[in-house]
Regions:
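Alpha-helical scaffold elements adjacent to nucleotide-binding pockets in ATP/GTP-utilizing enzyme cores
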Residues: 18, 43-47, 85, 113, ...
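Short, surface-exposed basic-aromatic patches at helix termini and helix-loop junctions that form
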Residues: 24, 45-54, 91-98, 119-128
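Conserved Lys-Pro-Asp/Glu-containing loop-to-beta segment of HAD-superfamily phosphomonoesterases
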Residues: 86, 92-111, 115
Length: 168
């Protein structure tokens, strides 16, 4: 809810401590991806500041643009929002750190969609499923992802899978 205060936001046990440790590592880029609407940015930044965590980037869903453009389904669909952001972020990593081995760690608070999103993401990154596989397209369709988002996901997946990189 947009009227929430930073102090009202609940934190999962040990999440703050874990993120504080990670945010203090100099060789680590920490990104915060949330399906919360852009209107929550100030509240979330205040909560992040209260928890003494430092993120390199914060991604929030632009629900206003979605509503104004008539893509109401996109407001509710977390996969079509989060998966492209993760893929684009990963592409930036392999472009910036192509000669280095790097690690990525994903954890979330959406017990329904995050496991699906992370499984699809990991399958792409680890090249377990091909970007042009009919199965891959069926998986994306089964997540109710709009056609234009499926094409964008396939294109980013292609770019990722054509690159050489070491990741864990």
């Amino acid at each position: 809810v947009v009227t929430e205060k930073a102090s009202d936001k609940k934190t999962f046990p040990y999440a703050t401590e874990t993120l504080q440790i990670l945010s203090n590592k100099k060789d680590l880029r920490l990104r915060f991806l949330s399906a919360s609407p852009e209107q929550m940015r100030r509240v979330l930044q205040k909560k992040i500041q209260m928890d003494e965590i430092s993120f390199d980037e914060v991604f929030l869903k632009d629900t206003t643009s979605m509503v104004m453009s008539g893509t109401i389904r996109g407001v509710l669909n977390q996969v079509s929002y989060k998966l492209p952001v993760l893929l684009q972020s990963f592409l930036q990593c392999i472009e910036n750190f192509s000669e280095q081995e790097f690690y990525h760690l994903l954890f979330g608070d959406d017990s329904e969609d995050d496991p699906i999103i992370y499984t699809i993401f990991e399958s792409i990154v680890q090249k377990k499923i091909s970007y042009n596989s009919p199965i891959f397209e069926r998986i994306l369709e089964s997540c109710s992802i709009p056609e234009n988002a499926i094409l964008a996901i396939q294109e980013m997946s292609k770019k990722i899978q054509q690159r050489e990189y070491k990741t864990h």
